[in-house]
């Protein structure tokens, strides 16, 4: 009888511990630099997004391009490039 009581108490404590919901990780505030701007990870710089948007705008403006293979590299120029047309003839 004396050994059953501590075992039952231990079993109840273990069951209560297992039945509890897992805690959500705490959200920490964003790291701010001394100027109040968010510190970005090394490979997540905002300038990369600007470059992608500028490339998209370039492809929208000049959709027709002429490409030529020279020394294993493709050189592509817009069709409107009058000064480069003798190069492709």
UniProtKB/Swiss-Prot annotation:
One of its GO terms (cellular component) is extracellular region. GO terms for biological process: determination of adult lifespan; negative regulation of feeding behavior; negative regulation of locomotion; neuropeptide signaling pathway; positive regulation of egg-laying behavior. Residues 20-26, 47-89 form a propeptide. GO terms for molecular function: neuropeptide receptor binding. It comes from the Eukaryota. Expressed in the M1 and M2 pharyngeal neurons from where the LURY-1-1 and LURY-1-2 peptides are secreted. Residues 1-19 form the signal peptide. The modification Tyrosine amide is found at residues 35, 43. Disruption phenotype: Eggs are retained in the body as normal during starvation but the number of eggs laid during the initial refeeding period is reduced and satiety-induced suppression of pharyngeal pumping is slower than wild-type. Keywords: Amidation, Cleavage on pair of basic residues, Neuropeptide, Secreted, Signal. This is Luqin-like RYamide peptides lury-1. It comes from Caenorhabditis elegans.
């Amino acid at each position: 009888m004396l050994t059953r009581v501590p075992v039952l108490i231990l079993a109840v404590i273990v069951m209560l511990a297992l039945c509890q919901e897992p805690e959500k990780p705490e959200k920490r505030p964003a790291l701010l630099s001394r100027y109040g701007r968010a510190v970005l990870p090394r490979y997540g710089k905002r300038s990369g997004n600007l470059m992608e948007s500028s490339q998209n705008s370039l492809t929208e403006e000049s959709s027709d391009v002429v490409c030529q293979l020279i020394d294993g590299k493709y050189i592509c120029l817009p069709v409107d490039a009058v000064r480069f047309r003798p190069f492709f003839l």
